[in-house]
């Protein structure tokens, strides 16, 4: 979805609710340059993905793990709660 900056200004609060509900970013166009409105959760997930894939070696390991999982050869034996506990209890 793409809207003008003027329209975004008029519809800001409904747009914030929309991107948090449907997780579809909204492109806001203006003469000064375009911007994107997206949920903070989606933004944080993108930032985490960029961080994890920044290292070519880490990216390779992650892609191999995804391929193993898709092939049904997942070595994942701990629950999310167990992993959270191992990581210090953070969500």
UniProtKB/Swiss-Prot annotation:
Q: What induces it?
A: Expressed in log phase cells. A member of the relJK operon.
Q: Which protein is depicted?
A: Antitoxin RelJ
Source organism (scientific name): Mycobacterium tuberculosis (strain ATCC 25618 / H37Rv)
Q: Name the job this protein performs.
A: Antitoxin component of a type II toxin-antitoxin (TA) system. A probable antitoxin for the putative mRNA interferase RelK. Upon expression in E.coli but not in M.smegmatis this protein neutralizes E.coli YoeB. Binds to and represses its own promoter, in combination with RelK repression is somewhat lessened. Several DNA-protein complexes are formed in vitro depending on the RelJ:RelK ratio.
Q: Which family does it belong to?
A: Belongs to the phD/YefM antitoxin family.
Subunit-structure text: Homodimer. May form RelJ(2)-RelK toxin-antitoxin complexes, in which the toxin is probably inactive.
- Molecular-function GO terms, alphabetical: DNA-binding transcription factor activity; sequence-specific DNA binding
Q: Pfam families attached here? A: PhdYeFM_antitox (PF02604)
Which UniProt key words apply to this protein? DNA-binding, Repressor, Toxin-antitoxin system, Transcription, Transcription regulation
| Name of the gene | relJ
GO process terms (BP): regulation of DNA-templated transcription
Indicate whether Nucleotide-binding appears among the record's keywords: no
